[in-house]
Amino acid sequence: MPKRTDIQSVLVIGSGPIVIGQAAEFDYSGTQACRVLKAEGLRVVLVNSNPATIMTDPEIADATYVEPITPEFVEKIIAKERPDALLPTLGGQTALNTAISLHGNGVLEKYGVELIGANVEAINKGEDRDLFKEVVEEVRKKIGHGESARSYICHSMDDVLKGVDALGGYPVVVRPSFTMGGAGSGFAHDEDELRRIAGQGLTLSPTTEVLLEESILGWKEYELELMRDKNDNVVVVCSIENFDPMGVHTGDSITVAPAMTLTDREYQTLRDVGIAIIREVGVDTGGCNIQFAVNPEDGRVIVIEMNPRVSRSSALASKATGFPIAKIAAKLAVGYTLDEIPNDITQETPASFEPTLDYVVVKAPRFAFEKFPSADSTLTTTMKSVGEAMAIGRNFTEAFQKALRSLEKKGSQFTFVGEPGDKDELLREAVRPTDGRINAVMQAIRAGATPEEVFDATKIDPWFVDQLFLIKEIADEIAESRELTADLLTEAKRHGFSDQQIAEISGLGEDVVRQVRHALGVRPVYKTVDTCAAEFAARTPYFYSSYDEESEVAPREKPAVIILGSGPNRIGQGIEFDYSCVHASFALSDAGYETVMVNCNPETVSTDYDTSDRLYFEPLTLEDVLEIVHAEQQAGPVAGVIVQLGGQTPLGLSQALKDNGVPVVGTSPEAIHAAEDRGAFGRVLAEAGLPAPKHGTATTFGEAKAIADEIGYPVLVRPSYVLGGRGMEIVYDETRLEAYIAESTEISPSRPVLVDRFLDDAIEIDVDALYDGEELYLGGVMEHIEEAGIHSGDSACALPPITLGGFDIKRLRASTEGIAKGVGVRGLINIQFALAGDILYVLEANPRASRTVPFTSKATAVPLAKAAARISLGATIAELRAEGLLPALGDGGTLPLDAPISVKEAVMPWSRFRDIHGRGVDTVLGPEMRSTGEVMGIDSVFGTAYAKSQAGAYGPLPTKGRAFISVANRDKRSMIFPARELVAHGFELMATSGTAEVLKRNGINATVVRKQSEGTGPNGEKTIVQLIHDGEVDLIVNTPYGTSGRLDGYDIRTAAVARSVPCLTTVQALAAAVQGIDALNHGDVGVRSLQEHAAFLIAARD
């Protein structure tokens, strides 16, 4: 039955900023869906607050709204655009919850908008834990299989305590309703833990409801991805097995597809139950994902939960099988059936054929505990990983070792040298699931543990344990052999060993192993992902490496450009870099090159099989990239490799690639060194006559102390060659400096520590620019709202700048040009400046695409990444202006006076992390980056744009109520004006004694409240922390004091996180918030699409 004719326009809701549990996979699914719907001739309206996504590019939808995803704003868009239908299943939990509220408050009915892709009843049956239990019971009556864990629904703490007795005691699982990524869930082993976890769960659940369940810790966990159309055709797209047993959130687990340890009969049972559930719930046009637990002792099957939408697992399943779930879900939503949709990859089989795999896929999660030293690293049912890598191999060991190597983290690959340690101690360590458990298991095996002991400690299935033993046996063979023979190398490679691992075991250099391997002719071949186990020919070149017989890479005539992606998402290197890689691929395709993408992140648009001409799903290590370059050179001419778009990962490979004779295009490895190495960069600045803050490099504490004494404290210390401010700290005195040097283990003459003067009270400025060797194109100038010293990735910023004048822009332009020329950039460069008093200091330069490129491109309506890719391959700025890729006149520094103002705000993952005692982690911003994503607010005035950015990131700013203020002495003077404004807007102020005193002297009334350290008052007056916990505070302003006195502040800020109260930690943020509150109180806040903003900017240029 072909598509419906009664729908002309569709509103698609995106997933907003990247947070833990809801990441780039929704950009991938949303982009696919928008393209499909547009190709079907529908008008597509999109709302998504995240500018770093491909889906918010103006060409993907017909009208793109970068606005907060809240029922209020989405209603404004519906009123303006009047769509016929709303598709909410592609934007994760955010989109689903928003659609449910719009349905509930009558907005959809009022404007005559139909929900497609999922009906409200099906969403509720899948999401509401009580209704879902009934569904599972129905299924069991019909087919005799499948049950739910015994459970108890609670709406208050009294219910919760009763529930434990009803379930027969601890441990119990706590799960809140309608949350995502396991937010607020956990295992409680005693009453203290129960009160803490359930209290937070009741707060986080929009329906104040939590479910207590019997514990099924240690059971095997599986997932099925299914799709169903309105004619009741159902396909099982993929089965996924979790390597880690129940108790670890599936997003934090190593997962394997297809499932490895199910018997045929067990698999059929899961299939039957899954198909019966999707029918019973009533998902009739789209995909869903169902999670199961199987008791290894008696085979009892429990259905854990389902997601009636496109999820993180569906992105993984799509990449693992080549079956594009999101694309097909969008087609089903507008009326097609599965048998009418062709399979893109074979082009001769329909989508109703279930994919079959002749390879194994392994996904491994990437964590960021090093960014939150106080956080508890135990893995639980609350998701904590920030990214993932996927690898494909011909067997489990090969895919598994490739996945670990793809994580690009020190110590992520198995190591087989040195003493493993004490067996019993290692087994004890392996009992607690953490990000490094798998390495502890391998060391325990090396120390002589038996398979039974490993299983008892970890409950990892015996089949997987055997595979780990197999990997260790191969390592022993390499260690015992006298020489590297062709047979030995082939065997090691077939089990996923890297040259680096083989080199370490045999005591040789990595390059020596590679030379021997090439001399013996042991090289990988590349196989195609074809959805059908080679039964039909694949038309899309989507490759993975294997040490097999024949290669499937076809020869070509056109010159190829190889683009290195950014690998797994992590804090500091996220989807923004993927955005630049995808744009480069599009631009170079248009310019007549064959584009080749290399990446291993399954969540992204870059690893979609139709983004580039060829896709290699491979780790981004030197060995893997060199083999791909070799394979492509055999196939046809290679114009070069682009390393400057994928962030720090490919940048770090540039010199080694060049040394191996690979043509690196764009900014040369030498130029990268000139910007990254402080000594070399100092010389560039000196030649251009530009001031940098006083600094020096040190390799010992003595040297560091001498520099700090000469510069004066506070100083900023950091290692060289890092991204995301890794390991940076502002040091206020000598004792802390000594401790910092002692903790930084990796100091060496080639990797010194940098000591810079820290500029207090400076305005930080970020510039993105293009340089072709002759001419500079200033992409955009962003003025940070927070002061210098807070990592630029965590700071909010405004473009065009709000307090800089024409003279400042002139100076910035001249300095940027001087640096770009001195370093030798060809393409993009990002420079951070600090304006202190009247002096413009250069903080650092990055000779690559920065994380602000997508934001700058959207704010100025110019595709910077596309232009950069062309410049890398020799185009000039003048040529690109003539072609129309860049504006004919002017640039991002000459925007019209009435240009819209865009504000970027960073989104932090504080709420996901707890320390071992269950307290939150501190929310103070510093020089080390901790945000996972970003949102953008755009409007004609700064106040409204800032208010939108806050609404998109943390929920709307309060417009009345009680505000608590407590600031450090250095901030007291600058706090008076914004505080007075708050009172004028009708806020009631509360403050600690010191701050209240200053306010009173300035004629501002504030109620004095007790600090946490003072305890409850004699007449039971609550402390500020108790007031926050009781929901009596609407806005918190708390700036930290130097290094001491942080503890009171810490308690206040962690309480704010636990209760989701807006908490501002700088006076600058307070001043911006006041402008935002003012805008909200005064005016009707409107919405405009990016296309309308762009039309305005383009008209202003002519």
From Swiss-Prot:
**What's the cofactor?**
Mg(2+); Mn(2+)
Q: Where is this region: Allosteric domain?
A: 955-1102
Query: Where are the annotated segments for Carbamoyl phosphate synthetic domain?
Result: 552-954
SUPFAM superfamilies per UniProt = Carbamoyl phosphate synthetase, large subunit connection domain, Glutathione synthetase ATP-binding domain-like, Methylglyoxal synthase-like, PreATP-grasp domain
Q: Which PANTHER family match?
A: CARBAMOYL-PHOSPHATE SYNTHASE [AMMONIA], MITOCHONDRIAL, CARBAMOYLTRANSFERASE FAMILY MEMBER
Q: What family does the entry list?
A: Belongs to the CarB family.
Query: What name goes with this protein?
Result: Carbamoyl phosphate synthase large chain
Gene source species: Streptomyces coelicolor (strain ATCC BAA-471 / A3(2) / M145)
